[in-house]
UniProtKB/Swiss-Prot annotation:
InterPro entries: PIN-like_dom_sf, PIN_dom, Type_II_TA_system_RNase, VapC_family. Its cofactor is Mg(2+). This is Toxin FitB. Toxic component of a type II toxin-antitoxin (TA) system. Plays a role in the speed with which bacteria traverse human epithelial cells; disruption of the locus increases the speed of trafficking about 2-4-fold. FitAB binds to its own promoter better than FitA alone. The expected nuclease activity was not observed for the FitAB complex, perhaps because FitA (the antitoxin) prevents metal binding and thus catalysis by FitB. Its EC number is 3.1.-.-. PANTHER family: RIBONUCLEASE VAPC2 (PTHR33653:SF1). Coiled coil: none annotated. It comes from Neisseria gonorrhoeae (strain ATCC 700825 / FA 1090). Keywords: DNA-binding, Hydrolase, Magnesium, Metal-binding, Nuclease, Toxin-antitoxin system. One of its GO terms (molecular function) is magnesium ion binding. Mg(2+) binds at residues 5, 104. The keyword Ribonucleoprotein does not apply. CDD domains: PIN_NgFitB-like.
Length: 139
């Protein structure tokens, strides 16, 4: 079971997406793939920060009408149990000289709570958080 990081789920939206990543996404059994609420927030923020125009409108529509509906019932919240894991992950990393970005920590904690592998290109924070990681660009 897989939790997609923002850079993975957004890859097909790029003007020239990585073919390997797109093929990997297409090979997945959708019911085994999840998003975190944090990833949804990052995706929506990315669209909101674009200048008004056709690109913003197209990306907004693709996100809200095509991508997010695919994950209905499989968008995992940042709740109290995940918050407790987040605090453990970030404090452990910090006391051991490792840095985990806040958003990556939220996503890592969500993965840990639900025993999921994180699919991401940015593996460092997730390795530091001691969660299972898969990089569809290289693995």
């Amino acid at each position: 079971m897989i939790l997609l990081d923002t850079n993975v789920i957004s890859e097909p939206l790029r003007p020239q997406p990585n073919e390997r990543v797109v093929a990997w996404l297409d090979s997945l059994i959708l019911e085994d793939v999840y998003l975190s609420a944090i990833t949804v927030a990052e995706l929506r923020l990315g669209v909101a920060l674009l200048l008004n125009g056709k690109k913003k409108n197209v990306l907004h529509e693709r996100l809200e009408q095509s991508i997010l509906p695919l994950f209905a019932g499989r968008i995992l919240p940042f709740d109290e149990p995940v918050a407790a894991i987040y605090a453990q992950i970030r404090s452990y990393a910090k006391t051991h000289g490792k840095e985990i970005a806040a958003a990556d920590g939220y996503i890592a904690a969500t993965a840990k709570q639900h025993s999921l592998t994180v699919a991401t290109r940015d593996t460092g924070s997730f390795f530091a958080a001691d969660v299972a990681v898969f990089n569809p660009w290289h693995d």
